Amino acid sequence: MRAPTTDLLGEPWTAETIHFPPDDEGAVVATLIHRRADQPTGRAVLHVHGFADYFFQTQYAEFWTARGYDFYAVDLRKCGRSLLPHQSPHFASDLRDYFPDLDAAWHRVTQRDGHHHVVLSAHSTGGLTGSLWADERQPGLAGMVLNAPWLDLHGSTLMRTLGTIAVERIGGRTPYRIVPRRVDGFYARSLHHEHEGEWEFDQELKPIMSFPVFAGWLRAVRRGHAQLQSGLDVGCPTLVLSSASTAWPQEMGDDVHQNDVVLDVEQIRRWSPALGRHVTYVGIPGARHDVTLSLPEPRAQVYDELGRWLTAYVDGDEH
């Protein structure tokens, strides 16, 4: 473990490198990013990113710190700040490979730093991984906020079934084989200020044309989907936010900015109740895949919904 240093986001953000035993590719690290609230607090949020992503959503973090929560984010092994030169980006053969990263982050947030009221926040694939971790570990979360969690593939039942069978075979035999897919870059372009968006992020850590999808990783995701769809109990109130609609545009335009162009939101709606016994789902009209990076009007609704949910189910439950 290295002492926290100033993060690539600059002051007041810090980053702490956490070392783990090497795997088949070599050395492994995760990175814990942190910003304190203005006043000392026992409340915190721990955020987990999605695929081909890393933590850069500072406006989202500022929502939490203004509410009196210390904010933490973890860049998981082989992702974002934690991607090392010898590694296959975002590769994991089992989503449980990420559990030590979350365990280490949780220990630092709670045992070391003394927070006793902690919300787990997660986006896209991170929402799947975080939910499986919460179900298995039962850490005593105060709440969980999932931003467009990846709970199933899109497409017909037949295509999802056939695809899963193929991925199971190929991913088991040749886990580092790259899965062919159509990548148009529309989504990342809609976000970045040098293209059609307003946000700033490192295009090496979050490439406009994404990262390769490895068969072993997709196999791990499909196994995670099956486990979630059999029913979880994350043990806390859960808010699921997504765009109200999905679109598969063929050109850059308004549809890219006003829909989820990555995941099928109908699958998010369908499977959200499988997360636990207390789940609230809200679809945000006009929102992007990462709802916190939406255009101003739907983004304002995101924060309104999140604030109301926290007031109703989470903030008042501190003890």
Predicted regions and their residues:
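Catalytic active-site module of serine/aspartate enzymes centered on a nucleophile-bearing elbow/loop
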Residues: 278-319
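Short beta-to-alpha linker loops that shape the active-site pocket of alpha/beta-hydrolase fold enzymes
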Residues: 51, 75-80, 150, 285-288
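Short, surface-exposed "cap/lid" segments of acyl-processing enzymes
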Residues: 34-76, 83-85
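Alpha/beta-hydrolase fold nucleophile elbow
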Residues: 112-124
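Alpha/beta-hydrolase-fold enzymes
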Residues: 125, 129-213
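N-terminal cap/lid segment of alpha/beta-hydrolase-fold proteins
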Residues: 1-39
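Serine-hydrolase catalytic core
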Residues: 178-279, 283
